[in-house]
Amino acid sequence: MSFFGFGQSVEVEILLNDAESRKRAEHKTEDGKKEKYFLFYDGETVSGKVSLALKNPNKRLEHQGIKIEFIGQIELYYDRGNHHEFVSLVKDLARPGEITQSQAFDFEFTHVEKPYESYTGQNVKLRYFLRATISRRLNDVVKEMDIVVHTLSTYPELNSSIKMEVGIEDCLHIEFEYNKSKYHLKDVIVGKIYFLLVRIKIKHMEIDIIKRETTGTGPNVYHENDTIAKYEIMDGAPVRGESIPIRLFLAGYELTPTMRDINKKFSVRYYLNLVLIDEEERRYFKQQEVVLWRKGDIVRKSMSHQAAIASQRFEGTTSLGEVRTPSQLSDNNCRQ
């Protein structure tokens, strides 16, 4: 709560009408801690009251008006002075005058558009909040209350498997397969690795889940890679013809839905990174983008349509070239 010099005269509180029944969700704060906030979805009404309690009943509080705002904004940490608002709604609660006793003002924002998921990342924060303001001649009295928004999707109508042969010419050829290209946040990644040719002494193989956060545009683009999980799928030397199964449960990891070009400010993408390490500690890897989405119980045709036409682009640098193309790694990486 920010009182700015007049905080001792009045206490401001924002109360939601359905606070007792509304679900709360954990959300990471900027300092890395997790706190629980009231959970909302796109299109839901936000209603409640702003309560003003005079701390000294014998004193009056003059003001230039009282208002409540619902705001959705994006803050880029390298540009903290500018807040980019994509939702901004305001309701006037009282005209200029005096507050002579404690009182409450009702408010309602009907069917509020909340197009993006709440997000706190390495270089960007997307938040929704209510802000009550008592306008004063010198310093305003301000109270904010954050909420969390989740974006829901239905099962994608198109969800093909991922299958690819990669390798180093005359040294290593493998075939990997993942059962889907799109996974919900509580899903299980099922797949297999099949060794077609092994002339490198591989001692270890793992799959990493990598989150890539991209912020900014043009020359001011920042990329932040975060390894969310490391999953060992093999310890020891494989032989030709060997097949290694993959079964990776996503529910145990801190993941968000894939976010693409959010308000032209940032993106969040996820990659499965297949890593092989040989006896000389050299690393060979292949990245494959997958789409993550939040499964919802509410069926919405518009969301289903968006999920069906969502573009599939699998990008990312790789050290294992596809078998059908010339390898960028030299043959001296092989060990007979």
From Swiss-Prot:
Family statement drawn from the similarity comment of this UniProt entry: Belongs to the VPS26 family.
Subunit annotation: Component of the heterotrimeric retromer cargo-selective complex (CSC), also described as vacuolar protein sorting VPS subcomplex (VPS,) formed by VPS26 (VPS26A or VPS26B), VPS29 and VPS35. The CSC has a highly elongated structure with VPS26 and VPS29 binding independently at opposite distal ends of VPS35 as central platform. The CSC is believed to associate with variable sorting nexins to form functionally distinct retromer complex variants.
Described purpose of this protein according to its UniProt entry: Acts as a component of the retromer cargo-selective complex (CSC). The CSC is believed to be the core functional component of retromer or respective retromer complex variants acting to prevent missorting of selected transmembrane cargo proteins into the lysosomal degradation pathway. The recruitment of the CSC to the endosomal membrane involves RAB7A and SNX3. The SNX-BAR retromer mediates retrograde transport of cargo proteins from endosomes to the trans-Golgi network (TGN) and is involved in endosome-to-plasma membrane transport for cargo protein recycling.
Nucleotide-binding keyword on record: no
Protein's recorded name: Vacuolar protein sorting-associated protein 26B
One Gene Ontology term from the biological process aspect of the record: regulation of macroautophagy
UniProt KW keywords: Cytoplasm, Endosome, Membrane, Phosphoprotein, Protein transport, Transport
Residues found modified as Phosphoserine: S302, S304, S319
Localization, UniProt: Cytoplasm; Membrane; Early endosome; Late endosome
Organism encoding this protein: Homo sapiens
Lineage per the UniProt record: Eukaryota, Metazoa, Chordata, Craniata, Vertebrata
A Gene Ontology term for the protein's cellular component: postsynaptic recycling endosome
InterPro entries: Arrestin-like_C, Vps26-related
Membrane association type: Peripheral membrane protein
